[in-house]
Amino acid sequence: KDFKDNKNNRFEVADHFNSKFLASGPFWGYPAPNNGRYGDIPYKKPMGYGVLLPSEKRLIEQTLTNAKSVWQLNGVGCVGGQALLGIPIVDNLRKFVSTSIWPFELENSKVVCAEIYPSIFTIEDSEVFKDASQVKTVVNTFFTLDLEGQLDQLMKVPMSLNNEVITHEGWILGAKI
């Protein structure tokens, strides 16, 4: 839950999910001080990925080596918290407008939600905050590609991806294999 005062419960959600695993993790990284508040979230990356835990990195994170793991909740460049907060918001959006999730759902809809990784683009450093510059760059890039009739090409699922990646792991829009 993302609250109006900019507080959220991402660490509580991750702590709950982690409690379902036999090993420590898979979510990791919490803000200090913790004082035992998140007993099932290790501070540092746990051992056991791919054995007792899900894989640490999807194929896309192995391909884009600077991309962070979705399991990292805290620290520079982490995306785990964004994923935990963003997925329910996207799901809620689907109640109000025809929405598809790329690459899992390829049918036509009014809104297409896709995972992005701004670092695959040359970022226009035009804003005070780096995140704002990154979002502005990605939006402008996709807008230009759409005007030029090239966005459809970008949204074609790379042919070299296997079905497991397409249906289970997902992919980052615009990333090349």
Residue map of PLM features:
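RNase H-like (RuvC/DEDD) metal-dependent nuclease/polynucleotide-processing core
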Residues: 1-177
